[in-house]
Amino acid sequence: MNVKQLHTQAESIFGKRGQLLHLWQEIADNFYPERADFTLRRQPGDEFADHLMTSYPVLVRRELAGQIGTMLRPSATPWFKMVPSDPEREDNDSKRWLEWATGLQRRAMYDPASAFSRAMKEGDNDFAAFGQPAISTELVWDNPNENGPHLLYRCWHLRDM
């Protein structure tokens, strides 16, 4: 497949997104007005939720997103750990190293510079409303405002995917 064929295929696939964007716009209008800009662009000063008769759908989505985050990532208890893919390689030294690496990963994720909590909270809201989030993880090497390299988590708007 050459570049021209790949470009043609991408244009065809993205051209079929129109109906999906309209569906997401309708869902967002009713359940997630903060993200209701799939098919329109907001101007400063626009009212974004003035069409809602009640805030109940928005509150239900927010509550569901909060519950998803609480169940999947309880901040008070460790919710993940590293293990070897081959159980036979799990000896005392490897367990100690994996425990250390798990702690290092947890500290990197919950470092305020990583924005992990914010990205996951946005992702939980996207999942509650649309059934899927778009989350990326990056390694930032040269940020003069931070001390050394760190992870950066971002939740992207589905319209941009």
Regions found by a protein language model. Name each.
Residues 1-161:
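Extended, helix-rich architectural segments
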